[in-house]
């Protein structure tokens, strides 16, 4: 890389760090071009990205954005995976790493919290934000649907329930 290209490359990485609250740092040594392309396509479908970075430039960008805590993770053949949705990204990367031994998860950062490999794997086991929202809505709607079901029962059924209660007393 030419010296004149380095500031532009650092600026690109700085923009990724600023726009993406979730970053996973990986080693990609041994992945084929088709494997990297496959990973990029699956990440793109989840609005995430994969970028191979030079370690010195990634460290400079980390220092410029206040992410000094991850600067020590940049060693070896490094690529960053970035997204605004940490759980979906973690699931994709962890599953890809299971299927391809050549992708190694080193660590990452989510909302300014540094994560190690184990934490990223645990993060991938959580339900995504949209799944949680769906579950909460379902839980909130369940009691209302039961009441509606009882009220919509045929009047003869309601009369039998009232008659049974009256005869019981």
Curated annotation (Swiss-Prot):
InterPro entries: Ribosomal_uL10 (IPR001790), Ribosomal_uL10-like_sf (IPR043141), Ribosomal_uL10_bac (IPR022973), Ribosomal_uL10_bac_type (IPR047865), Ribosomal_uL10_CS_bac (IPR002363). PROSITE patterns: RIBOSOMAL_L10 (PS01109). Pfam families: Ribosomal_L10. GO terms for biological process: translation. GO terms for cellular component: large ribosomal subunit. SUPFAM superfamilies: Ribosomal protein L10-like. Gene3D superfamilies: 3.30.70.1730, 6.10.250.290. One of its GO terms (molecular function) is large ribosomal subunit rRNA binding. Belongs to the universal ribosomal protein uL10 family. NCBIfam families: PRK00099.1-1. Part of the ribosomal stalk of the 50S ribosomal subunit. The N-terminus interacts with L11 and the large rRNA to form the base of the stalk. The C-terminus forms an elongated spine to which L12 dimers bind in a sequential fashion forming a multimeric L10(L12)X complex. Forms part of the ribosomal stalk, playing a central role in the interaction of the ribosome with GTP-bound translation factors. This is Large ribosomal subunit protein uL10. It comes from Rickettsia massiliae (strain Mtu5). The gene is rplJ.
